[in-house]
Amino acid sequence: MSEFERWEGRFSTPDFIFGVEPNYFLASCDELLPKYGRALAVADGEGRNGVWLAQQGLDVVSLDFSPSAQIKAAQLAKRNGVEMKIVQSDVHNWEYPAEAFDVVVEIFTQFSSPDQRHLKWTGMKKALKPGGMMIIQGYTPNQLKY
């Protein structure tokens, strides 16, 4: 089973598999965020973090490769009265635009292999404006065993 099939299968359930509240670590960064600007939510899944960033006043691009997750992300944004652009692409191969975002966020980076992380983080760094903020949270790959 491919990674796409695995994630699409997980996200194709009616429930939000990670819930609808933002990641705790991300929410704890609220006072550090700019009051306006553009944010990129990488591997945003069902949109809980992208929606929260939009609620903070940021213009959000939510990036994920699962169509089922993106349908739920759009529903969650609508339910919360915010808008965000939803882009379907593999986060490891997306053509990250240069210096386009004030904030770049990736939560749960452990789902990418070390080689994939290098590709993704290179793109994320490219997409970050000078002086911008990058927020990354993850665990070791061993965490996936639990």
Which sequence ranges carry the predicted segments?
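Conserved class I S-adenosyl-L-methionine
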Residues: 1-34, 36-45, 142
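Conserved SAM/SAH-binding beta-strand->alpha-helix loop
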Residues: 66-68
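Conserved SAM-binding strand-loop segment of SAM-dependent methyltransferases
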Residues: 80-92
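A short, conserved alpha-helix within the catalytic core of class I
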Residues: 111-124
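Conserved SAM-binding motif I beta-strand of class I
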Residues: 59-64
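Conserved beta-strand signature within the Rossmann-like core of class I S-adenosyl-L-methionine
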Residues: 131-139
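A short acidic, Gly/Pro-enriched loop at the edge of an enzyme's catalytic core
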Residues: 92-103
